């Protein structure tokens, strides 16, 4: 789960991380009175969307008068902001964060992530802040600093000292950086975060370190322990089909292709998407119905897939272990009769009760294309939509 910048800063401040401060606006009629509450010479108006690249797209404006700030805020509120992360459709700006500006002497990058490949927590830092870290990693990888934390021992003093040293901090600033590392680590652990990113972390004209922008992504599996964080969820920033799927207990991610996929198991789902690409087409989604799906969940899964107007065909790939193939077959038939599947549908079943499932499908009277293995299924669905 993602949250907005102003929410991320609120959490970080609770853990002792110094951040820039401001006020959030969620209604256009509140813009003027909100800006009037700020006593500053420089105003920073920031669009609040769950995507990076806001500055380059015009979603962050720095102005030097109250009246100019009001005009910029009114112009920005409600627009469709298109960044390199939103795609061409953009994201509507329903919230603004208006901050007091500050003098910047130097910008840094600092983040903490769970590194799945190394099975540990990793700090990533760079003296090149305020730009895309991916660009820095590609062009000047030597400027990327990494420190891994063994989960068995946790954060140690040498991690904090090492990060401060590698970033070139000395004396009081080194002490500040060590405290920020400790605070960010504590926030990461205690909130079940998957990533905390501060970009940029700045040194201001007073020599103080400050988080000027912040992003936090949370592990969805840990949200049950954090109702206060769950309450920060902004459903307007999420794909409505993904929200609908989550409410139905389905794992769904919309993609840019035209072949809808319904699979049980994340690994099998990824293999299915890969083989669709191998045969010359693109998946429209990742959809894992899980191991305990019943007839109604299968029916809802197909409805969600067909709600995507880009879908020209559907590939169902089920390995019946915990899930029985006959249950899947009944769900497919129920969905087909209820909503009327008007695109090619290829079904590949294997495992528990596969013969019964195939019999149910063949006797349904519906135009369902059977497949014997994954390669056969991918070939048939790609040919069917051509």
Curated annotation (Swiss-Prot):
The keyword Transcription regulation does not apply. GO terms for molecular function: ATP binding; magnesium ion binding; succinate-CoA ligase (ADP-forming) activity; succinate-CoA ligase (GDP-forming) activity. Its cofactor is Mg(2+). Pathway: Carbohydrate metabolism; tricarboxylic acid cycle; succinate from succinyl-CoA (ligase route): step 1/1. Residues 9-244 form the ATP-grasp domain. GO terms for cellular component: cytosol; succinate-CoA ligase complex. Pfam families: ATP-grasp_2, Ligase_CoA. ATP binds at residues 46, 53-55, 99, 102, 107. It catalyses: succinate + ATP + CoA = succinyl-CoA + ADP + phosphate; GTP + succinate + CoA = succinyl-CoA + GDP + phosphate. Binds 1 Mg(2+) ion per subunit. It comes from the Bacteria. Succinyl-CoA synthetase functions in the citric acid cycle (TCA), coupling the hydrolysis of succinyl-CoA to the synthesis of either ATP or GTP and thus represents the only step of substrate-level phosphorylation in the TCA. The beta subunit provides nucleotide specificity of the enzyme and binds the substrate succinate, while the binding sites for coenzyme A and phosphate are found in the alpha subunit. Belongs to the succinate/malate CoA ligase beta subunit family. This is Succinate--CoA ligase [ADP-forming] subunit beta. It comes from Rickettsia peacockii (strain Rustic). The gene is sucC.
């Amino acid at each position: 789960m993602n949250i907005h910048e102003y929410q991320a800063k609120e959490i970080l401040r609770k853990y002792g991380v110094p951040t820039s401060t401001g006020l959030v606006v969620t209604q256009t009629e509140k813009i003027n009175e909100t800006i009037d509450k700020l006593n500053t010479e420089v105003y920073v108006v920031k669009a609040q969307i769950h995507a990076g690249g806001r500055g380059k797209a015009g979603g962050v404006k720095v102005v030097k008068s109250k009246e100019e700030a009001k005009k910029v805020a009114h112009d920005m509120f409600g627009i469709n902001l298109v960044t390199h992360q939103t795609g061409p459709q953009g994201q509507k700006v329903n919230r603004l964060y208006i901050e007091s500006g500050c003098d910047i002497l130097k910008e840094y990058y600092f983040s903490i992530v769970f590194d799945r490949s190394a099975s540990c927590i990793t700090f990533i830092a760079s003296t090149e802040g305020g730009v895309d870290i991916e660009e820095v990693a590609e062009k000047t990888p030597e400027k990327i600093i990494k420190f891994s934390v063994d989960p068995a021992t946790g954060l140690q003093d040498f991690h904090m000292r090492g990060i401060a040293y590698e970033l070139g901090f000395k004396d009081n600033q080194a002490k500040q950086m060590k405290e920020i590392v400790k605070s960010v680590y504590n926030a990461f652990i205690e909130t079940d975060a998957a990533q905390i990113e501060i970009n940029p972390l700045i040194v201001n004209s007073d020599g103080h370190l400050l988080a000027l922008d912040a992003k936090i992504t949370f592990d969805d599996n840990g949200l049950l322990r954090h109702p206060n964080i769950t309450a920060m969820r902004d459903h307007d920033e999420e794909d409505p089909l993904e929200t609908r799927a989550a409410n139905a207990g389905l794992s769904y991610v919309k993609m840019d292709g035209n072949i809808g996929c319904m699979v049980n198991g994340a690994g099998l789902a990824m293999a299915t998407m890969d083989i669709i690409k191998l045969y010359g087409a693109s998946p429209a989604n990742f959809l894992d119905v899980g191991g305990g799906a019943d007839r109604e969940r299968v029916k809802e899964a197909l409805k969600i897939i067909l709600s995507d107007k880009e879908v020209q065909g559907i590939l169902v790939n089920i390995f019946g272990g915990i899930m029985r193939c006959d249950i899947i077959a009944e769900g497919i038939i129920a969905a087909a009769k209820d909503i009327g599947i008007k695109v090619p549908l290829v079904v590949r079943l294997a495992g528990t009760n596969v013969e019964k499932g195939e019999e149910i499908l063949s006797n349904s009277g519906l135009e369902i294309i059977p497949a014997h293995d994954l390669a056969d299924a991918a070939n048939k669905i790609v040919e069917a939509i051509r």
